[in-house]
A protein has these predicted regions:
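Short, flexible/disordered secondary-structure transition segments
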Residues: 39, 57-58, 81, 99-103, ...
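Short amphipathic alpha-helical segments embedded in low-complexity Lys/Glu-rich regions
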Residues: 47, 133, 163-171
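Core helices of alpha-solenoid repeat scaffolds
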Residues: 17-28, 56-70, 101-117, 162-166
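Acidic, Ser/Thr- and Gly/Pro-rich intrinsically disordered linkers and low-complexity segments
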Residues: 120-142
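Positions within the helices of HEAT/ARM-like alpha-solenoid repeats
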Residues: 38-40, 80-82, 138, 142
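Hydrophobic residues within the alpha-helices of tandem HEAT/HEAT-like
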Residues: 28, 46-54, 66-74, 81-99, ...
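N-terminal "cap/leader" segments of large eukaryotic alpha-helical scaffolds
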Residues: 1-42, 166-176
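Alpha-solenoid helical repeat architecture
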Residues: 32-35, 74-77, 120, 135
């Protein structure tokens, strides 16, 4: 079988209110560019836990600060880094109702879309997610990850979001 990691139940060492989210969340998001394990896992899982442990009012004002780090990860054109950045974008959009509005207002869609356009036909398998508790995560094709994230962005962004996506990724079909 595949090597596995022993997992503990995630919990903060103290109350979540004592954690400096504005300081640490951008650091963890910036770490999604890293492709070596276990640093990659720590960056991705740390980002997810911070986002899930805090509320709407704490995370939404930080989204404009996260966009440059996500864009830097996407601009590496390194499939694992691109997959990690898209996974974080998907998490933000699914966890918080107003995240898409913040992304549209801070021009996040426009800044995040050029790389998915260039890699939309990339069939490289990348390791994503650590829910399976297998070292490195489960494998998924990058083009599938890109399509799922763009579909979520189109669904949450409405007509304006779909129009922006179609302007940067002309081959995108949300019904596919």
């Amino acid at each position: 079988g595949a090597p596995q990691i022993r997992w503990r139940q995630p919990r903060w060492p103290g109350p979540a209110s004592d954690f400096a989210v504005a300081t640490w969340l951008p650091v963890f998001v910036e770490g999604c560019r890293v492709t070596m394990e276990p640093q990659r896992m720590i960056a991705i899982e740390g980002t997810k836990q911070i986002i899930q442990a805090h509320d709407y009012y704490t995370i939404l004002p930080l989204i404009p600060q996260l966009v440059p780090h996500l864009r830097a990860a996407l601009n590496t054109s390194n499939p694992p880094a691109v997959a990690a950045a898209l996974e974080i974008v998907s998490l933000l959009l699914t966890e918080f109702y107003g995240a898409v509005d913040v992304l549209l207002e801070c021009d996040g869609f426009r800044r995040l879309l050029p790389t998915p356009n260039t890699l939309s036909n990339c069939t490289v398998k990348v390791r994503v997610g650590y829910r399976t508790k297998i070292v490195g995560g489960e494998q998924k094709r990058l083009d599938v990850i890109i399509h799922e994230t763009l579909s979520l962005m189109a669904e949450k962004g409405g007509v304006r979001g779909l129009r922006l996506i179609k302007s940067y990724v002309p081959t995108f079909d949300p019904g596919r």
